[in-house]
Amino acid sequence: MQKICKPNLLELTKFPVQIIMENVFFEKQEMEGVQFVVRIFKTIEGAIHQIQEPQEDCWIAMTNPTATEIFEMSERFGIEVDDLRAPLDEEERSRIEVEDNYTLILVDVPMIEERNDKDWYGTIPLGIIVTKKMIFTVCLEDTQVLTRFMEGRVRNFFTYMKTRFILQILYRNATMYLHYLRIIDKKSEQVEEKLHMSTRNQELMELLELEKSLVYFTTSLRSNEVVLEKLLKVESIKQYPEDTLKIV
């Protein structure tokens, strides 16, 4: 039996970043069983709050936005429609695009898909768009990479510190990959043990699915690493003095 080649977990999650946040509210809108969510958050007097209208130094979080919402955001904030749509395409590659009035950062984030009562692991794009006055996130579905910020479970998070927020998102993303990689590693060992005592195809198929997840994760993490390296060289991303502090 061929054994899965497991990547070095520490090597795959090398991101030179720290993390951090406070309290938040949640609002959802459903349409034909699919959630379309646009939420706006802002740090007010040291705490994170959900607000009704965009303001300077706010965070606009868009989950599976409609075509109308994308067009409205594009018209209002001068962001290209294609750049707002890009994170909604599962085939989009991780990259950085620097425009005149904003910067688009695309990275892959891990996700869980349930099939046949089992959890399988894959990746979807997350877009981070940084303008001079605010920051946007765009994703096809709610991701645990961002929910910690929304649920008030990250300390010292401030929407006006855009560079720090980006690095916090990337750090959170790396920790989620590490968490899922450990689960995949453990599941692989369990399935391999079953294979020694069984000749059924079920275990072989499960092992192949886990191997596919590892390939997705490995490819995505390498692409994300390239994005991070380029990000640290982008002059349009303002560096705040506080961003260099070590947060514990």
Where in the sequence are the language-model features?
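Peripheral, non-transmembrane regulatory/ligand-interaction domains of membrane transport proteins
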Residues: 2-247
